[in-house]
A protein has these predicted regions:
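Juxtamembrane intracellular "pre-TM" segments in multi-pass secondary transporters
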Residues: 4-14, 197-253, 441
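Helix-loop boundary and gating motifs at the non-cytosolic
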Residues: 9-65, 248-288
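Hydrophobic core of transmembrane alpha-helices in multi-pass small-molecule transporters
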Residues: 24, 107-123, 257, 341-359
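Helix-to-loop junctions at the C-terminal end of transmembrane segments
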Residues: 68-81, 166, 298-312, 403
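Structural signature of the two symmetry-related core transmembrane helices
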Residues: 84-98, 313-329
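Glycine-rich segments within core transmembrane alpha-helices of 12-TM secondary carriers
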Residues: 144-162, 385-395
Length: 441
């Protein structure tokens, strides 16, 4: 296999990144997917059971990403056909989306949502590898930024379509899965036409060697394995807690656990809460759209904002901003009744899911990038991915039960408290040395 620097000596060639636009239709299709599934489960089962089933669906969706990442990682190592895997992934997503319309059972809905989680990961790594395999190294950063932007804009357009659909056909939400499936087929066809198999292939670990590729891959899905972590890897990751010299990595993992448990708790119950307060489906999609739009814009400036500041400080700022937003939504859920709940949701959710997430994500993944390069990359990334997957799954699973039996406001306030706890943990991290900072360049 060639190294990631293998193309550095090539003569300048025109950019061959038109294939990146094949990701746009499927991003449109999957942008509103989680919201659609949650609303549909409530339609099928009512508010209480629909919320619990929504939590179960989200938990399985997050949990299945762990074996999916392992399976597709091994497949990529053995089958060096980028175009085939990407086209197959999109086609399988299309089949799963269209099948929502024909099997309208709760079990079938949860199963298909889980299938989409599994098959969509087949394309995440090949897409990022293709950039490094087909573009000159000087163009990598720009190509990764374009891939991220095209995907995000697709999600925004998908949510915008959902807002219009919910206004025109409010009783036919399930029918929306059919055009979303057609868009996925379009992406599959475009990938076959536009993607050219690279002249040389790279190993998966090269994605962890460069910050742009590392960030873009984790943004697509934060679960990414180079090797399968062993029990000793987990023990080593948390063993240094007792010493002030070695506690940085364990504290970082603990703060990550708290963040993703909090995210699972909040995100799983947020849509059902709006439905409980008689917020229309159109307005629900509009709130999620606002969050995605702000997130897309925030990521365009987050790198520059974080780059000039201490990483621990910016991580704390992102956590505090998100935590106070969650707490504000929790207080609103406690004090308000009826559709007026959409007002604080429309203000605070874009702050939490957009601006605060972009700041925290950029800061935390920069620290993770440093961790990967200061230790065994495969082990460190494997532990991180397992931690993220399990934490997200756990938060999603208990979210529905807490909301139904104790109240949605309890779920949201607890989500904020967990983030404040993460602030206390991450605030104990040692400030990065100049050596660490240079490793991030």
């Amino acid at each position: 296999m060639n190294s990631c620097d293998g193309g550095s000596g090539l003569m300048a060639k025109p950019s061959r990144d038109k294939w990146l636009y094949s990701t746009f239709p499927i991003s449109v299709a999957t942008g509103p997917l989680g919201t659609m599934v949650q609303l549909y489960l409530i339609q099928l089962n009512g508010q209480a059971l629909g919320t619990i089933y929504g939590g179960l669906a989200s938990a399985i969706y997050n949990g299945i990403s762990i074996p999916a990442a392992l399976f597709w990682g091994l497949t990529i190592d053995r089958l060096h056909k980028r175009k085939g895997l990407i086209a197959l992934s999109y086609a399988m997503v299309a089949i799963a989306l269209v099948s929502f319309y024909f099997d309208r059972s709760t079990g079938g809905t949860i199963a298909r949502y889980s299938v989409i989680s599994f098959v969509s990961l087949a394309s995440a790594t090949p897409l990022n590898l293709l950039i490094m395999e087909t573009e000159q190294k000087s163009r990598w950063a720009g190509a990764f930024a374009k891939l991220s932007l095209v995907s995000s804009l697709g999600n925004v357009v998908g949510l915008l379509v959902s807002v219009v659909w919910a206004d025109l056909l409010p009783a036919q939400l399930v029918l929306l899965f059919v055009p979303m499936g057609a868009l996925s087929v379009t992406s599959s066809a475009l990938s076959v036409v536009l993607i050219k198999e690279p002249e040389f292939v790279l190993e998966r670990e090269t994605l962890a060697a460069r910050r742009p590729s590392f960030f873009t891959r984790l943004l697509a899905n934060p679960v990414f394995f180079i090797t399968i972590p062993s029990l000793s890897d987990f023990r080593r990751a948390f063993r240094g807690m007792r010493s002030s010299l070695t506690r940085g990595v364990p504290l970082f993992y603990i703060s990550t656990i708290l963040f993703y448990v909090s995210s699972g708790l909040f995100n799983t119950s947020f849509v059902p809460a709006m439905h409980l307060y008689s917020v229309s489906d159109q307005e629900v999609f509009a709130v999620i759209l606002a969050g995605m739009a702000v997130q897309t814009l925030s990521f365009q400036v987050a790198g520059r904002f974080v780059g000039d500041r201490n990483l621990v400080t910016t991580s704390v700022q992102g956590l505090l901003l998100r935590g106070w937003s969650y707490l504000g939504i929790g207080v609103a859920a406690l004090l308000l009744t009826g559709p007026i709940f959409v007002a604080p949701a429309l203000v605070l959710y874009p702050i939490a899911g957009g601006l605060a997430f972009a700041i925290y994500y950029t800061s935390a993944n920069t620290m993770m990038f440093t961790t990967v390069h200061s230790k065994s990359a495969g082990a460190a990334l494997g532990v991180y991915s397992a931690v993220v997957g399990i934490a997200s799954m756990s938060g999603s699973f208990v979210s529905g039960f807490i909301s139904v039996y104790d109240g949605y406001y309890v779920t949201f306030i607890l989500s904020g408290v967990l983030l404040f706890t993460a602030v206390a943990v991450i605030g104990r991290l040692p400030k990065p040395s100049s050596r660490d900072e240079s490793a991030l360049q």
